[in-house]
Amino acid sequence: MAAPLRYALTLLAWLCMLVVYAPLVPASVLLISPALSFAHWQALFADPQLPQALLATVVSTIVAAVGALFIALAIVVSLWPGDRWRSLAGRLPWLLAIPHVAFASATLLLFAEGGLLWRALPAFTPPMDSYGIGLGVTLAVKESAFVLWILTVLLSETRLSGQVIILDSLGYNRYQAMRWLILPSIAPALGVVMLAVVAWTLSAVDVAMILGPGNPPTLAVLSWQWLSQGDSDQQSKGALASLLLVMLLALFALVGYLIWRIWRRTLPSVHGLRQPHVPALSGKALSRALPLAGLLCALLLAVLARDATPDVDALINSLQIGALASVLALVMLLLWLEWGPRHRHRWVWLPILLPALPLVVGQYAVALRTGQDGQFSTLIWGHLLWVAPWMLFVLQPTWRRIDPRLILVAQTLGWSPIKIFCYLKCPLMLRPALIALAVGFSVSIAQYMPTLWLGAGRFPTLTTEAVALSSGGSTGILAAQALWQLLLPLLVFMLTAGISTWVGRARQGMR
């Protein structure tokens, strides 16, 4: 390839990523500038809603993170390695396709006062949940599927599974294997995964608006409400509340690291002391309950929807935005993987590892400054900040595993780098690209805050309509909105899986 073309493609890859990640800079400025005023801090801490909102946020986050980790590790202890683990791993993409808002809507319609459970058992009155425990439990169930999905990758090493089998054969039970072998091996990567879970839970606005607590709400919802007001003083309080979310994330990360360091020092040496094998009934029950929860969510929404139809405009907008955002992200990421840097690009994971609310504030500031708020293209640009890193998470491992000998053979045949990219690497990436498209579409469907702010309310989606209806409205229409929000990603996953199977018939390496 001629040097000018290579430089042009490298520049294009960098420009695409910088345009998408540009809001990180104004987000930092908007968070720091109010923090320099002592009066703004006084106004924030003087607000009577802050202590309860902070407490509800901390409690719901701890319940969600610890619960998701417990469910995932209990299932690993019970099923891994084995055929049942592989069977569950094959069903995880379908569970991940269920958006948080759809799952939360089903939970609301089942357990809330006036829901199905309340109608069946009138004596059952849901207790007041001012600490966000119900929110945390719901997110724990939903996020456990994500943690399990990552664990399927981390536990895919043949060496690790072989060592567990050896421990089993020597008489050590599964809990000893988990404590002495599995956790120490995967702890660094698992820590990053849990950081992403905590970051998402801290800034969950849509799910918290559906499930509560209501008054005062969680800190993310409170910050969202302040930032949405026209008063500059209230907006400063909202920015400081967003900064508090970042500080809470740092605090959770520090506490998690300290717990890991302390726990690692307590690891005993293996002196041959066996413990009796205890049936892992909880893990087996959870492995059955997790897919069942997804199935019940879909059935409940289908029953409650009855003859109600979703908003056609919201359905079309969701489909268009999700398709365009995922396709654009795929093209951009393939360019980035081929012509981007090989090292020192960890900043691309920041949207996953940081609370979403400050990033949306940065996006909105850029859109206002450029006069592009309320535009359809701006809406797609806003979704790319979260669609791109999740799709890169799917694409990057396969890209790095491409056999360099294939590239060497192509080079000896005189192929140019652009020809190698188009005729060798892209066909090899077809299957992960299809999976990435489905993941990107699902991530785009779930976006609430960027859609509402960057679209200026002009482009309703299934997510925004479901959140709006959750505060009051027709149960059937809410169920229909949430059902279609669930069905769209599921249909895309089925479509990409079918295409992958069809293409793999003619390509042995892709089966």
Q: Which residue stretches match the model-derived regions?
A:
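Glycine-rich helix-loop "coupling/hinge" segments at transmembrane-helix boundaries
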Residues: D206-D233, A446-G476
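Short amphipathic alpha-helical coupling elements at transmembrane boundaries
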Residues: A39, A43-A46, A89, P122, ...
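Short cytosolic juxtamembrane segments of multi-pass membrane proteins
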Residues: R264-P276, G457, S500-R511
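Membrane-water interface segments at the C-terminal ends of transmembrane alpha-helices
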Residues: A2-A35, F45-S156, S185, A189-D206, ...
